[in-house]
Amino acid sequence: MTAVTSTTDFDYEFDAAKGIQRNNLPPFAQRMRKAADLVWEEGYQQPFIRELGEGTLQRERFAFYLLQDFRYVNDYARVHALGLAKATDPEIMAFMLKVQNGALQVETEVHRSYLASYGITEEQMNNVRQSAFARAYTSNILSIAYGKDILDILVAVLPCAWVYADYGYRLAAEFADTLDNNPYKSWVDMYKTDEFWQDSVWLLDHIEKLVADASEERKRELIDIFVTGVENEYMFWASAYDMQYTWKPEWNQAR
């Protein structure tokens, strides 16, 4: 197996002629990625992601994740709907609409397919109890979508798009020899593609343009939004691995 690791150099000269690539990021994208690097790489090495790539992840853990993610995707779509309402640039409006529709149609179909094979009904999916970690994540991005401007919204939705594109790509390369027999192959297949990565490219490009005249204080605010999102991605998977609904496992006994 060939492991694909992230570059540790985030201070290189961006080659605009090549366009945005995984190893050719514009300056502000480099700053965001560098700021999140510790949690980003710990996220890729955490048990949920490793076992998913190996195909050894317990089905119960994956089902817990899928049910929580099913709820998350619906809120993610709402964030894009709010972004659509706030946007004045037709190109941004079109992107928000595209992602909203894709989240509700394409991604939820993968969830439904897996969950149906596990004997989980549509009613159970729609009535699943949201974990504290998932609720913290969605509450954060919804709060930004309601109370902030379009640039904040673009940065808030970037971690989900970028982390999934990166992890999917790296898992597909690292476990290429065994992926065909992996029960989670369709999950990896969905996120490994260049087509999925292009959503991140679009976001990175437009964020870069919108921060061009921003103050340093404003840029730091946006970096904080981004890093918080990457941290929430980490905890989303970690809590799914532990199948944990509450902040502390023992608190679940009172529910």
Regions found by a protein language model. Give the residues of each.
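Eukaryotic N-terminal low-complexity, Ser/Thr- and Lys/Arg-rich leader segments
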Residues: 1-22, 249-255
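Acidic, carboxylate-rich catalytic segments that either coordinate divalent cations
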Residues: 4, 223-255
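Short alpha-helical hairpin
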Residues: 6-14, 20, 33-57, 76, ...
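Hydrophobic alpha-helical segments
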Residues: 19-20, 24-28, 32-33, 140-146, ...
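Active-site-proximal alpha-helical scaffolds that flank and shape metal-associated catalytic sites
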Residues: 20, 91-198, 227, 231
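Alpha-helical bundle segments that constitute or directly flank the non-heme di-iron/ferroxidase center
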Residues: 37-42, 57-86, 106, 155-165
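A non-catalytic, amphipathic alpha-helix used as a structural packing/dimerization or gating element
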Residues: 64-75, 98-102, 221, 225-228, ...
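Long amphipathic all-alpha helical oligomerization modules
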Residues: 193-226
